[in-house]
Protein backbone atom coordinates (compact mmCIF):
# COMPACT_ATOMS: atom_id res chain seq x y z
CA UNK A 1 0.00 0.00 0.00
CA UNK A 2 1.49 3.31 -1.03
CA UNK A 3 2.16 6.00 1.48
CA UNK A 4 -0.47 8.64 2.04
CA UNK A 5 0.58 12.24 1.68
CA UNK A 6 -0.04 14.83 4.37
CA UNK A 7 -2.48 16.56 2.07
CA UNK A 8 -4.43 13.32 1.50
CA UNK A 9 -4.51 12.48 5.20
CA UNK A 10 -5.64 15.90 6.31
CA UNK A 11 -7.65 17.02 3.34
CA UNK A 12 -5.75 20.33 3.36
CA UNK A 13 -4.38 22.12 0.33
CA UNK A 14 -0.64 22.45 0.81
CA UNK A 15 0.06 24.14 -2.51
CA UNK A 16 2.83 26.68 -1.82
CA UNK A 17 1.28 30.09 -1.38
CA UNK A 18 2.82 33.06 -3.09
CA UNK A 19 3.47 35.72 -0.50
CA UNK A 20 2.75 39.22 -1.72
CA UNK A 21 4.89 41.78 0.05
CA UNK A 22 3.04 44.54 1.82
CA UNK A 23 3.34 47.78 -0.10
CA UNK A 24 2.79 51.13 1.50
CA UNK A 25 2.45 54.28 -0.56
CA UNK A 26 4.76 57.05 0.69
CA UNK A 27 3.06 60.07 2.20
CA UNK A 28 3.39 63.07 -0.09
CA UNK A 29 5.12 66.13 1.38
CA UNK A 30 4.26 69.63 0.21
CA UNK A 31 5.38 70.10 -3.38
CA UNK A 32 8.11 72.78 -3.30
CA UNK A 33 8.11 73.06 -7.09
CA UNK A 34 4.57 74.42 -7.04
CA UNK A 35 4.85 78.16 -6.54
CA UNK A 36 2.84 79.73 -3.74
CA UNK A 37 0.87 82.73 -4.94
CA UNK A 38 1.48 85.41 -2.35
CA UNK A 39 -0.90 88.34 -2.39
CA UNK A 40 0.26 91.94 -2.57
CA UNK A 41 -0.16 94.25 0.40
CA UNK A 42 -0.86 97.54 -1.33
CA UNK A 43 -0.38 101.14 -0.24
CA UNK A 44 1.30 100.27 3.04
CA UNK A 45 3.02 102.97 5.07
CA UNK A 46 6.69 102.09 5.46
CA UNK A 47 9.04 103.48 8.09
CA UNK A 48 12.79 103.05 8.50
CA UNK A 49 14.60 101.25 11.31
CA UNK A 50 18.16 100.01 11.71
CA UNK A 51 20.32 97.63 13.67
CA UNK A 52 21.64 99.40 16.76
CA UNK A 53 18.87 102.02 16.80
CA UNK A 54 18.47 103.48 20.28
CA UNK A 55 15.03 103.82 21.93
CA UNK A 56 13.13 107.09 21.60
CA UNK A 57 9.86 108.46 22.93
CA UNK A 58 8.09 107.40 19.74
CA UNK A 59 9.88 104.04 19.51
CA UNK A 60 10.77 102.67 22.95
CA UNK A 61 12.27 99.40 21.67
CA UNK A 62 16.07 99.37 21.12
CA UNK A 63 17.36 97.48 18.08
CA UNK A 64 20.62 96.02 19.35
CA UNK A 65 18.63 92.76 19.55
CA UNK A 66 15.82 91.48 17.34
CA UNK A 67 12.85 89.29 18.18
CA UNK A 68 14.88 86.28 17.03
CA UNK A 69 18.50 87.28 17.65
CA UNK A 70 19.59 88.53 21.06
CA UNK A 71 22.98 89.56 19.64
CA UNK A 72 21.73 91.12 16.40
CA UNK A 73 24.04 94.14 16.35
CA UNK A 74 27.07 92.05 17.30
CA UNK A 75 26.30 89.42 14.65
CA UNK A 76 25.76 92.13 12.04
CA UNK A 77 29.20 93.52 12.76
CA UNK A 78 28.29 96.90 14.18
CA UNK A 79 25.93 99.85 14.03
CA UNK A 80 23.98 100.09 10.76
CA UNK A 81 24.31 103.87 10.56
CA UNK A 82 21.32 105.26 8.62
CA UNK A 83 23.06 108.57 7.80
CA UNK A 84 23.39 108.57 3.97
CA UNK A 85 26.82 110.18 4.26
CA UNK A 86 27.97 107.15 6.27
CA UNK A 87 26.89 104.59 3.69
CA UNK A 88 28.34 103.27 0.45
CA UNK A 89 27.04 100.68 -2.03
CA UNK A 90 23.93 100.09 0.09
CA UNK A 91 25.88 99.19 3.24
CA UNK A 92 27.66 100.91 6.14
CA UNK A 93 30.81 102.70 5.05
CA UNK A 94 32.91 101.65 8.06
CA UNK A 95 32.59 97.85 7.93
CA UNK A 96 31.49 94.93 5.80
CA UNK A 97 28.20 93.61 7.21
CA UNK A 98 28.18 90.00 8.37
CA UNK A 99 24.42 89.75 7.83
CA UNK A 100 22.33 90.87 4.88
CA UNK A 101 21.90 94.69 5.07
CA UNK A 102 18.63 94.35 3.14
CA UNK A 103 16.23 93.49 5.95
CA UNK A 104 12.70 94.35 7.09
CA UNK A 105 10.44 93.98 10.10
CA UNK A 106 6.83 92.81 9.87
CA UNK A 107 4.31 92.86 12.74
CA UNK A 108 4.14 89.15 13.52
CA UNK A 109 6.20 86.69 15.56
CA UNK A 110 5.37 83.00 15.16
CA UNK A 111 6.95 82.16 18.53
CA UNK A 112 5.59 82.37 22.06
CA UNK A 113 9.04 81.51 23.41
CA UNK A 114 12.07 79.44 22.43
CA UNK A 115 10.12 76.23 23.03
CA UNK A 116 6.71 76.91 21.53
CA UNK A 117 4.99 78.34 18.45
CA UNK A 118 1.82 80.40 18.55
CA UNK A 119 -1.28 78.21 18.06
CA UNK A 120 -2.29 79.79 14.74
CA UNK A 121 1.18 79.58 13.16
CA UNK A 122 0.70 76.21 11.44
CA UNK A 123 -2.64 77.36 10.03
CA UNK A 124 -1.79 80.82 8.72
CA UNK A 125 1.85 80.65 7.55
CA UNK A 126 1.79 79.59 3.86
CA UNK A 127 5.23 77.93 3.87
CA UNK A 128 4.76 76.14 7.21
CA UNK A 129 5.18 72.65 5.73
CA UNK A 130 8.25 73.76 3.77
CA UNK A 131 10.14 75.35 6.64
CA UNK A 132 13.79 74.45 6.94
CA UNK A 133 13.94 73.82 10.70
CA UNK A 134 10.85 72.01 11.97
CA UNK A 135 11.82 71.84 15.63
CA UNK A 136 9.55 73.30 18.29
CA UNK A 137 10.39 76.89 19.14
CA UNK A 138 12.31 77.55 15.91
CA UNK A 139 10.92 80.45 13.92
CA UNK A 140 9.70 79.78 10.41
CA UNK A 141 9.57 83.51 9.61
CA UNK A 142 13.13 84.74 10.11
CA UNK A 143 15.00 85.02 6.83
CA UNK A 144 11.99 84.76 4.53
CA UNK A 145 12.13 87.06 1.52
CA UNK A 146 9.83 89.91 0.57
CA UNK A 147 9.49 91.91 -2.63
CA UNK A 148 8.94 95.64 -2.14
CA UNK A 149 7.80 98.15 -4.75
CA UNK A 150 8.01 101.92 -4.39
CA UNK A 151 7.22 103.91 -7.51
CA UNK A 152 9.17 102.24 -10.32
CA UNK A 153 11.78 100.67 -8.04
CA UNK A 154 11.67 97.02 -6.94
CA UNK A 155 13.73 95.72 -4.03
CA UNK A 156 14.14 92.40 -2.21
CA UNK A 157 14.92 91.89 1.47
CA UNK A 158 14.83 89.35 4.28
CA UNK A 159 12.42 89.36 7.21
CA UNK A 160 14.67 89.71 10.28
CA UNK A 161 12.62 91.37 13.03
CA UNK A 162 9.07 91.99 14.23
CA UNK A 163 7.21 95.28 14.16
CA UNK A 164 6.39 98.07 13.86
CA UNK A 165 4.78 98.32 17.30
CA UNK A 166 3.11 94.89 17.41
CA UNK A 167 3.99 91.23 16.91
CA UNK A 168 0.60 89.51 16.58
CA UNK A 169 -0.96 90.93 13.42
CA UNK A 170 -1.16 87.72 11.37
CA UNK A 171 -4.44 88.87 9.80
CA UNK A 172 -2.50 91.58 7.96
CA UNK A 173 0.83 89.79 7.40
CA UNK A 174 -0.72 86.59 6.03
CA UNK A 175 -4.31 87.65 5.38
CA UNK A 176 -6.13 90.48 3.64
CA UNK A 177 -6.60 92.94 6.52
CA UNK A 178 -5.02 96.36 6.90
CA UNK A 179 -2.38 96.78 9.64
CA UNK A 180 -3.71 96.91 13.21
CA UNK A 181 -1.11 99.50 14.15
CA UNK A 182 -2.32 103.11 14.09
CA UNK A 183 0.95 104.89 14.91
CA UNK A 184 3.11 106.56 12.23
CA UNK A 185 0.20 106.70 9.79
CA UNK A 186 -0.63 103.04 10.35
CA UNK A 187 2.85 101.80 9.44
CA UNK A 188 2.86 98.14 8.40
CA UNK A 189 6.50 97.48 7.52
CA UNK A 190 9.91 98.69 8.71
CA UNK A 191 12.68 98.97 6.12
CA UNK A 192 16.43 98.94 6.65
CA UNK A 193 18.55 101.89 5.43
CA UNK A 194 19.72 99.77 2.47
CA UNK A 195 16.15 99.10 1.37
CA UNK A 196 15.28 102.78 1.87
CA UNK A 197 18.20 103.92 -0.26
CA UNK A 198 17.60 101.40 -3.04
CA UNK A 199 13.94 102.43 -3.28
CA UNK A 200 14.85 106.12 -3.18
CA UNK A 201 12.65 106.71 -0.14
CA UNK A 202 12.89 109.16 2.72
CA UNK A 203 12.31 107.97 6.27
CA UNK A 204 8.64 107.31 5.55
CA UNK A 205 6.86 106.35 2.37
CA UNK A 206 4.18 104.21 0.76
CA UNK A 207 5.02 100.81 -0.69
CA UNK A 208 3.48 97.62 -2.01
CA UNK A 209 4.99 94.40 -0.73
CA UNK A 210 4.52 90.64 -0.81
CA UNK A 211 6.36 87.48 0.16
CA UNK A 212 8.34 85.79 -2.60
CA UNK A 213 10.07 82.43 -2.94
CA UNK A 214 13.84 82.66 -2.95
CA UNK A 215 14.08 80.82 -6.29
CA UNK A 216 12.32 83.77 -8.00
CA UNK A 217 14.63 86.52 -6.72
CA UNK A 218 17.14 88.04 -9.17
CA UNK A 219 20.64 88.91 -8.06
CA UNK A 220 21.26 92.45 -6.92
CA UNK A 221 22.84 94.34 -4.02
CA UNK A 222 20.70 92.21 -1.66
CA UNK A 223 22.71 89.16 -2.76
CA UNK A 224 26.20 90.38 -1.80
CA UNK A 225 26.54 90.06 1.96
CA UNK A 226 25.58 88.02 4.97
CA UNK A 227 26.05 84.63 6.57
CA UNK A 228 22.23 84.54 6.80
CA UNK A 229 21.85 85.13 3.06
CA UNK A 230 21.15 82.07 0.84
CA UNK A 231 22.83 83.85 -2.08
CA UNK A 232 26.01 83.70 0.01
CA UNK A 233 25.24 80.47 1.87
CA UNK A 234 23.09 78.18 -0.36
CA UNK A 235 22.42 75.81 2.54
CA UNK A 236 20.06 78.45 3.90
CA UNK A 237 17.75 78.31 0.89
CA UNK A 238 14.43 77.79 2.73
CA UNK A 239 13.09 75.53 -0.03
CA UNK A 240 16.25 73.47 -0.59
CA UNK A 241 15.44 70.86 2.08
CA UNK A 242 11.83 70.74 0.88
CA UNK A 243 13.01 70.04 -2.67
CA UNK A 244 15.33 67.29 -1.44
CA UNK A 245 12.53 65.69 0.61
CA UNK A 246 10.16 65.85 -2.34
CA UNK A 247 12.67 64.17 -4.66
CA UNK A 248 13.14 61.38 -2.08
CA UNK A 249 9.36 60.97 -2.01
CA UNK A 250 9.19 60.74 -5.83
CA UNK A 251 11.92 58.08 -5.87
CA UNK A 252 10.08 56.06 -3.21
CA UNK A 253 6.86 56.36 -5.21
CA UNK A 254 8.66 55.12 -8.33
CA UNK A 255 10.19 52.18 -6.44
CA UNK A 256 6.83 51.17 -4.94
CA UNK A 257 5.19 51.30 -8.38
CA UNK A 258 7.96 49.09 -9.79
CA UNK A 259 7.56 46.53 -6.98
CA UNK A 260 3.79 46.50 -7.41
CA UNK A 261 4.14 45.83 -11.13
CA UNK A 262 6.57 42.94 -10.55
CA UNK A 263 4.34 41.35 -7.90
CA UNK A 264 1.45 41.22 -10.37
CA UNK A 265 3.41 39.35 -13.01
Language-model region placement:
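Bacterial N-terminal signal peptides
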Residues: 1-3
Amino acid sequence: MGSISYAQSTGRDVTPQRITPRISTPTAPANPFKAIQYQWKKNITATVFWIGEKPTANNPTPNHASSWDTAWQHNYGGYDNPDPSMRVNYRPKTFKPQLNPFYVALPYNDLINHRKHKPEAARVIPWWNRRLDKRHGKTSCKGRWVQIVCGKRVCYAQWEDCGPFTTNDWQYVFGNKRPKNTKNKGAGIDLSPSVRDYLGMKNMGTVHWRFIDFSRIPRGPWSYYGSNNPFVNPRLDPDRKAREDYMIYLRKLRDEAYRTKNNRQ
